[in-house]
């Protein structure tokens, strides 16, 4: 029991800075939503629809780079930290290469919005946001590369501090570009995209400065000898991260596709849906931060070839994540009306958002289990299993069931946006079951785990 208690303490110490950093980053979305809503419901809806294109695109790149965390953690755990700079340098090249297609997708995303038959004003504002925020993509991915470097070495505080710097900068920049203060143009919701691009470049430059001067990182010497791009190594990182990227993409696009599918239902429905989704994203940062900590701990233990320790870390993470989810679900049920008032003063938006947050509270527990289980599997480098489980859960179960319930009369009268939220519940519950079963199976087959650890050591 004492071993489990010590592991939970380690997870809390690792996950708390990750949580605060993630909340700060997600808080930027909260600020964008609130400040755009201060202009009009149309501007608020434009930010929501644009985010449904921007986030899946850029988080696909983040997923590719998340493979660096267990790689760095295992090298550090096995006493081979001198090989870390080479991996990070190749990660930088991968980030730059990945940002190019992401920027092209964002620039040409207008046809996706037009296909949803939205109002002309909403279309123009959404496209304007995307054309502004596309310049954030390279900075976002480069920042993620350096963040993975720090987190793989169990240094989770730097991203937390820099996340707050970004959030603090986002508010005045939004104030300038949304409302036209200090001589800046009044761009409304489009101004949120301009502010976001500036903020992510600021965060990347700040993280670069930290990794250059931090005493704790001197032993690694990240910038002493810069490695040239190695095609085979970049491809290996891409291949390792692709299942993670696709699994994140499938989850995010489940929510993004719903935002697009409900857009013909009107700005009020889109705005209420955005309120509930944005708050759910804030709450999701708690189990997500625990998942990052579990991935680090499992990777580190595998580097030490301590398979039992890796198992303890994953079990503690699942228990802790589920406990926190139960607490947040209860708080959401109690305070959902007050929360909705933070986002909007439109009574129709508030009424619908309150009912949607009731459904959000229901799926928080299974959402926590699935994300922590996926974090443990990332630590085991069992990336393909994550990809398969999430694909089935989100695109075979979640989205189709949501569409059938929400937009057709095959089962009952169309439920509108509520049907899609029941689809969320079904998809996330399926994901939790499949990923947990896979984790338990993997831990009962230690030969498979030993092979993966040995493979890592051979490659390096």
Swiss-Prot record:
It is a multi-pass membrane protein. Keywords: Antiport, Cell inner membrane, Cell membrane, Ion transport, Membrane, Sodium, Sodium transport, Transmembrane, Transmembrane helix, Transport. InterPro entries: MATE_fam, MATE_MdtK, MdtK-like. This is Multidrug resistance protein NorM. One of its GO terms (molecular function) is antiporter activity. Multidrug efflux pump that functions as a Na(+)/drug antiporter. The keyword RNA-binding does not apply. The chain crosses the membrane at residues 18-38, 53-73, 94-114, 126-146, 159-179, 185-205, 242-262, 276-296, 315-335, 349-369, 391-411, 415-435. It comes from Aliivibrio fischeri (strain ATCC 700601 / ES114). Its main location: membrane. GO terms for cellular component: plasma membrane. Belongs to the multi antimicrobial extrusion (MATE) (TC 2.A.66.1) family. GO terms for biological process: sodium ion transport. CDD domains: MATE_NorM_like. It is found in: Cell inner membrane.
